Amino acid sequence: MAVLSTIYSITRASTPTMASLTNDSPSPLPSSSPSKLPSPTSPSKKPLKLRQVSKQMGSQNQQRRGNKPSIAQIERAFGSGSYRDSEGEMDMNTVFDELLLGHANKFESKIEKKLREIGEIFVARTEPKLRSSGKPVLMFTIQWILPIWIMSLLVACGVIKLPFSIPFLDDLIM
């Protein structure tokens, strides 16, 4: 926001000096020494060029004053804020097409097609091994971990009383 206010103050400060120039008078150009300016008595073509330059600058200044950008345009130029139209209609269409049609309407390059095929081959080769390797883990969980967890829960709730008394365990449960 500080950048925007600085830009605005710089343009406001520089606009009145240029706007005060008339189209008929030559614009004062910055020069390093006053001797380089043409003398008004000597006949030369530079005053004519200076008049043309000042007329062009005057018309540009009028265009600048007439076309002040809005705050939204300034924010868009700096990239702050989000706008719906910046996403583009093409992106919206591809998402819509993928939801309805799957990948039937998607155009793939050769590299994308090759990567997809390699991925499908990798899944086809490794999936049966992963499915069979999950069975021992499931059986261990059902046979050992689940019964121990259920017994611990019943003891903690007080449904099952232990035949011995340990003060630490009693304090922990209660």
Swiss-Prot record:
Disruption phenotype: Impaired chloroplastic NAD(P)H dehydrogenase (NDH) activity, probably due to a reduced stability of the NDH complex. GO terms for biological process: photosynthetic electron transport in photosystem I. Keywords: Chaperone, Chloroplast, Membrane, Plastid, Thylakoid, Transit peptide, Transmembrane, Transmembrane helix. One of its GO terms (cellular component) is membrane. Residues 1-54 form a transit peptide. The chain crosses the membrane at residues 140-160. Residues 30-45 have a biased composition (Low complexity). PANTHER family: NAD(P)H DEHYDROGENASE SUBUNIT CRR3, CHLOROPLASTIC-RELATED. CRR3 is not conserved in cyanobacteria and seems to be a subunit of the NDH complex which is specific to the chloroplast. This is Probable NAD(P)H dehydrogenase subunit CRR3, chloroplastic.
